[in-house]
Amino acid sequence: MVFCVVSKGMPGRVELPECDIAVFGFGGLGEVDYEKELKGESEKFEEAARLSQKLNCGLVCGCKTLSRGLLRKSVAVADRGKLMGISDMNHVLDGEQFKSGVGLGFYKVNGCKIGLCIENDLMFPDTFKALSLCGCNAVIVVMEEIKDGIPPLLIRAYSYLYGVPVVLCGGRTACFADVSGAIATSVQDVTLFEICPQNKYHIVTTRTRGISSDIKSDY
């Protein structure tokens, strides 16, 4: 499974190598107004879907969506001509101007089960734990930019702990972490990461108090 991370350029305006899933950051679609999309005044989501059909691959694009005055950080997902859905960032920190979304982004794209993590959601481990339990083959993280070394550190830890490879697109930087704890970083305009999905499980036992196994005769 080959992921192509585009750190510079917009869908349709950059030459892409052959890949299974192409990932664009927040510069991919820019700001998308739902009302204009519905009225046909803009066709950004449709253009993304058409491009995925042209390239015969999945397409993951960061964007900011506007709906009735509410601004959200979102990711649009298309698969070979079909718009699969739009997922929103769930966690808004310290009075940011954005509105929080609800639910996890989980899609089957080009035969691969991918989970989405958007910007602030990276700071919350439950996001990755839930996506791992859902059976994701990979998690894609989309951020506006990587300001320090924390995001690469986190994706490395999450990939190792939860057994899911992670691809990160953050501004001009692309990162990849696999389940072994290895990490790769690139500042090229276009970067390819190859993932071999694995489903390795461990039997983990624990002891706890309570949950009595005694059968009561007066039940």
Where are the model-predicted features located?
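Active-site-proximal beta-strand elements of phosphoester/diester hydrolases
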Residues: M1-M10, C112-D121, I140
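Structural signal for conserved beta-strand scaffold positions within catalytic alpha/beta enzyme cores
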Residues: V5, C61, D88, L116, ...
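Residues at the C-termini of beta-strands that transition into short coil/loop
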Residues: S7, G81, G170
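Cys-nucleophile CN-hydrolase/nitrilase-fold catalytic domain and related Cys-dependent amidase chemistry
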Residues: M10-R80, K147, P151-R156, Y160-V164
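Short glycine-/small-residue-rich Rossmann-like dinucleotide-binding loops
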Residues: G27, I118, E144
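CN hydrolase (nitrilase-like) catalytic-core segments centered on the catalytic cysteine
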Residues: G40-V60, F128-F193
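Glycine-rich beta-to-alpha transition loops that act as phosphate-gripper elements at the mouths
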Residues: C63-L66, L122, G170-G171
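Active-site catalytic loop in hydrolytic enzyme cores
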Residues: S67-C134, L153-L154, L161, V187-D189, ...
